[in-house]
């Protein structure tokens, strides 16, 4: 069983390298037309240049997974902001794409919790489609739209989970097919359990990104030993291995909040279940300390008897 690792957005080890510098619409409104264009250009350029720095860092540390920041382009989906964020930065997008392809990196997006398809309000679905389209356009500009995924949660229950799931199946039909093909779903920590999310993924033929921390915060009746093989099976029609999310609770009181680092003892039960299946999979670390937490966790995990470190960020067990 081979496990490859990655982290989310910011490389904590790099100084002043945020790929998610932003600009509020309020501050945007206060500027003249030229100042708006200049500010949007400068912030986006900086985010892209920082992303390139981060990718070089990942390559140097043999980190094969990385989640791009959804905020890489400020105000990209705001209805009152017009900005050619693709055409203006074609060379930078291509540089990012070249690095990803040359080093065979697995790159993804994870829009925020407001991108959902369970609402009975049409504008919420419209906004979700707009946001998914933005993420797809960025992947396409990079040149990896046919091999990367955009991960979201199922959404809210709105007092009736059964009807909300029905709306999901109806609303998702409005998402262009080429974008839906690049979509994954994740179980959440309050509403949709692992079993419920799995059922939706199986019906829609959407790969399931399993989050172990969320699973432990929102348990279902079915044991993980039964669920995990079926979760991995949702990836069978793709040409890549399954991906899971890992983080640890901040505390017993704040169980859903992410800790700074990974608690190996919290994760061990999941790893033992995965070992019995003996299927290769990728792990996205979602701890607050990001790359630092990832590297520390790999070091701790590699000390377990039978676990072999085969590269800086890849283990075999």
From Swiss-Prot:
The keyword Hydrolase is annotated on this UniProt entry: yes
Gene3D superfamilies to which the protein is assigned, alphabetical: Divalent-metal-dependent TIM barrel enzymes (3.20.20.150)
Cytoplasm keyword on record: no
EC assignment: 3.-.-.-
Enzyme type, top EC level: hydrolase
Biological processes, Gene Ontology terms: nucleotide-excision repair; pyrimidine dimer repair; response to UV
Keywords: DNA damage, DNA excision, DNA repair, Endonuclease, Hydrolase, Nuclease
Coiled coil spans: none
Function as written in the Swiss-Prot or TrEMBL entry: Component in a DNA repair pathway. Removal of UV LIGHT damaged nucleotides. Recognizes pyrimidine dimers and cleave a phosphodiester bond immediately 5' to the lesion.
HAMAP family documented for this protein: UV_endonuclease
PANTHER family reported in the protein's UniProt record: UV-DAMAGE ENDONUCLEASE (PTHR31290:SF5)
UniProt similarity note: Belongs to the uve1/UvsE family.
Protein name in the entry: UV DNA damage endonuclease
Originating organism: Bacillus cereus (strain Q1)
Originating gene: uvsE
